[in-house]
């Protein structure tokens, strides 16, 4: 026997649903590896597991690498923010703007800025994803594996 992934269960049989089952359509899912290029050449391949945290985490990793000039390991270890309560492809609708979960390490100054923008907060110890990456720099591969999950980067 064999098993297949269950992401197809995200389809809806309601023809008016945003994720309705239609021939040739792919289901909404969060299996999203990421790849960064620079000058049309490979730079970083990475992934961040964690359901709805995946696209948010991917964006934060790219911002950390490109905008904040963090190295591959720092980009994964940096504190993260997760938004919850958004409308979902399964049909749930956002009604109140949701909330931000803040990982330990976000500065009080940044929290105050977010608060002034009207964000609501929740503090969580988990659910911020798990990241691994490989970067090609100067013809040398560099690996990173963040501390939130099991794993490590090694080479030979």
What are these regions (language model features)?
Residues 108-156:
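In a subset of proteins, long, contiguous C-terminal domains/tails are tracked
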